[in-house]
Amino acid sequence: ITHLIVCTTSVDMPGADYQLTKLLGLRPYVKRYMMYQQGCFAGGTVLRLAKDLAENNKGARVLVVCSEVTAVTFRGPSDTHLDSLVGQALFGDGAAALIVGSDPVPEIEKPIFEMVWTAQTIAPDSEGAIDGHLREAGLTFHLLKDVPGIVSKNINKALVEAFEPLGISDYNSIFWIAHPGGPAILDQVEQKLALKPEKMKATREVLSEYGNMSSACVLFILDEMRKKSAQDGLKTTGEGLEWGVLFGFGPGLTIETVVLRSVTI
């Protein structure tokens, strides 16, 4: 491991990157990147950063870790912030890790997915849509009522930017790994793009089993999809399809897009 990226909502000094380096016995000169308080879009952010590091540092192997303790936002009901109850109902704790590299060593390294293209954007007129604040009361969480509408309104533009160069305009022909911010977001995205219900099956399965684990969610969904694809006897890790998309949505409102290519099983 040459590089380490850690993403978490917790705050310690030295950070979790230091603790992991010691715990795993990594070399003391491993290049560490610590990302705090990024929120739900950061599962895409860590992959984008890892891709850049792997492509621009020959032989790099990047360990990516997302560890989220969203229980720190839990508190009693507030008359002034009823929206906090939404997050408390949806959130869950979770951690996931993967390794990113380029030029895999034949017969030794077996990639599961290939990252082809990445992007990050701020949705127009979305300031204050999702907020988190670290205050005396702890980490507070607030969101506007129309977050699902903002996401669904902007997702088509992100898809066109990502897939037009590949000649893909049928979004039922690709596999989907979308951050499961909540059922309402998934419902509106499905409706906006006329997606078949099975497109979000892996995403909804993770939301149902574990809740919204912030940045860790999309990594859980990647794992869920590749395992289910193998169990069902499909040809690729992406539900038998070649191309797919990974979306992260979070504070900002920030949207992360990753174009994925599956691998033959």
Curated annotation (Swiss-Prot):
One Gene Ontology term from the biological process aspect of the record: flavonoid biosynthetic process
Induction: By infection.
Tree of life domain: Eukaryota
Biological pathway: Secondary metabolite biosynthesis; flavonoid biosynthesis
Source species of the chain: Medicago sativa (Alfalfa)
SUPFAM superfamilies attached to this UniProt entry: Thiolase-like
PROSITE patterns to which the protein is assigned, alphabetical: CHALCONE_SYNTH
Top EC class for this record: transferase
Protein's name according to its UniProt entry: Chalcone synthase
InterPro entries linked to this entry: Chalcone/stilbene_synt_C, Chalcone/stilbene_synt_N, Chalcone/stilbene_synthase_AS, Polyketide_synthase_type-III, Thiolase-like
A Pfam short name: Chal_sti_synt_C
Function: The primary product of this enzyme is 4,2',4',6'-tetrahydroxychalcone (also termed naringenin-chalcone or chalcone) which can under specific conditions spontaneously isomerize into naringenin.
Protein family: Belongs to the thiolase-like superfamily. Chalcone/stilbene synthases family.
Alphabetically ordered keywords of this record: Acyltransferase, Flavonoid biosynthesis, Transferase
Keyword Acyltransferase included in the entry's annotation: yes
Tagged with keyword Acyltransferase: yes
Protein EC: 2.3.1.74
Residues passing through the membrane, by range: none
Residues annotated as catalytic: 40
GO molecular function (one): naringenin-chalcone synthase activity
Catalytic activity reported: (E)-4-coumaroyl-CoA + 3 malonyl-CoA + 3 H(+) = 2',4,4',6'-tetrahydroxychalcone + 3 CO2 + 4 CoA
